[in-house]
Design a protein with these regions (language model features):
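RNA-binding basic/glycine-rich loop and surface signature characteristic of RAMP-family CRISPR effectors
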Residues: 1-204
Length: 204
């Protein structure tokens, strides 16, 4: 029986991405549903982590055309470069675009968000600097570089799905090139292994 795609749904205990900061306060990314707030880890963060942990980015080559982008050419394409499996847009000369062969949803918490704010500062560093300058960190905190900050912390069970397009793996239609069956299978296995052992801590 021919299978065109593979989908798996994952439940894992993980931290969240951070979104916009207000002053020295960093807040986690959230989604609103049924009048409740749920923390999340973005699909972009998950995808990057999977590409790194699977080893897909080990052969990544980049170029600069206004912004850094993945290097693509007739000699270097998704059929022979695993780093391009997650999709690319290259604008050097002729513009080439290839969609990713695997897709992720955001990882959304199973339970609604309960804020846990953590407070920190760089007191030790500021005290060291104040001592060198002969000033008091208590009375001249600003001059000593004392900086208190706080951030929301969240680690909870989150749910996400990944779908792999088995017909697209290892294929680059921009250059009419395609990897062999063994290479395609190795890429799929690498993605699944990465999900199983994925680092579930993210900051920033």
């Amino acid at each position: 029986m021919k299978k065109n795609s593979l989908t798996l749904t994952v439940v894992a205990n993980m931290t969240s991405n951070y979104s916009e900061s207000l002053g020295n306060i960093a807040s986690v990314q959230k989604v609103f549903k049924n009048r409740k707030i749920y923390s999340m880890r973005s699909r972009e963060s998950l995808k990057n982590a999977i590409m790194v942990q699977s080893g897909m980015y080990d052969d990544l080559e980049t170029s600069l055309d206004g912004a850094a982008q993945k290097k693509v050419s007739e000699e270097l394409n998704a059929s022979n470069c695993r780093a391009l499996e997650g999709g690319y847009m290259n604008t050097q000369g002729t513009t080439y675009v290839r969609k990713s062969s695997f897709y992720l949803t955001d990882a959304v918490a199973a339970e609604h968000f309960v804020n846990e704010t953590r407070f920190h500062n760089n007191l030790y560093l500021a005290t060291n600097y104040a001592k060198e300058q002969g000033i008091s960190v208590q009375s001249n905190g600003g001059s000593a570089g004392l900086m208190p900050y706080q951030y929301e912390y969240d680690k909870s069970l989150k749910i996400y799905s990944m779908t792999i397009d088995l017909e697209m793996i290892g294929k680059d239609e921009n250059f009419h090139e395609e990897a062999d069956a063994k290479e395609k299978a190795e890429r799929v296995i690498a993605l699944l292994d990465a999900v199983e052992n994925l680092s579930l801590v993210v900051r920033g």
